[in-house]
């Protein structure tokens, strides 16, 4: 009844601004329904006495997707300009999968934290008892709310634990304990907690698996991207550990050396040019002159070992540097560069053999999309963050043409139940005959 009363004058009868007027109009509709036998008088009177039951539309802000939405914003701004982006009421559709996004960000942060922790504890942010300006020091850290870290101060140090209290002004202060097992990584060679942690120390904490854990803000950073290899849709993207501190997107903006992640491109180019899985490549010392006055270039395998004549397949399986360089030397760098350009990894790179080991820089999103043809049967994809843009009238002004191949990513089994193969840990294929 309330909705039926609104079309005549939506602003005048706005129930949020003018509840009494809106209620009067609603009751008028209810009365008309009763007068025309669409509603009993008893029900009509009961409804008239009821209060306006309003539910505001909930606007969801997905903090986990800050990097993703910022990249979309930058893209739309580059295409349509600042004015159209912010004043024309554009509706932008993306292929973002919030579940994938949440897990991707979680995985990225865990990887960065684990790497940083392996390099040891660098000490507290500051000490409240020793530094009068401790609040200034603490205010330098701006945390993304999805981290769910608390700021804490040590109130006592014991042999097997430390007691703390949170000091975050925006949250209710709580007291708790960090057990010895969650402090071990901070101690290193120092066995006593008292040698590392002191009363008044301030640091970050987080509750994990019902136990409080000490947190260290990492000095390293990274990015992660999840692509649909069949359509190119970007399902998840996180450009860094903490968006509040740095909006720099390490997926699309940072150029890094891919290293061994580039080797499959070298091997793919070789397969396109006559190499086979059983082609024998020499895994032995390799020396290349870099010119007058420069040291010779001597690449090495991981572990600094040589394995002699080895099949092409083994080279990619074990990521052998020397075999990869020899393949590049035999094949020729122009062929590798040609495939790199086709896959949009590089535009131009110097023709140096070190490029075959991933010495040239590229972005994570370009490298990831280059792997898609290995999955989808050889189809090149373009990473897609925007699938459609509509103006304020609902007219589509942009439509992504890379339609998803329906069913291409589904596993098809026409034999009913999946076969149950007993794991006997025995090798059933001979390498000498299986790849002829």
Predicted regions mapped to residue ranges:
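Glycine-rich, acidic and aromatic/proline-enriched surface loops and short helix-turn segments
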Residues: 1-9, 73-74, 226-241, 271-275, ...
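Short active-site loop at a secondary-structure junction
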Residues: 187-194, 217-222, 245-265, 278-284, ...
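A penicillin-recognizing enzyme superfamily signal
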Residues: 94, 98-101, 105-107, 135, ...
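Active-site SXXK
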Residues: 33, 104, 159, 231-232, ...
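Conserved catalytic neighborhood of penicillin-recognizing serine enzymes
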Residues: 58-64, 230, 275-336, 380, ...
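Active-site beta-strand/loop architecture of penicillin-binding DD-peptidases
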Residues: 69-84, 90, 222-257, 268-269, ...
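Primarily short, surface-exposed interaction patches in extracytoplasmic proteins
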Residues: 17, 238, 244, 252, ...
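Non-catalytic, structured segments within soluble enzyme domains
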Residues: 1-167, 327, 334-337, 341-342, ...
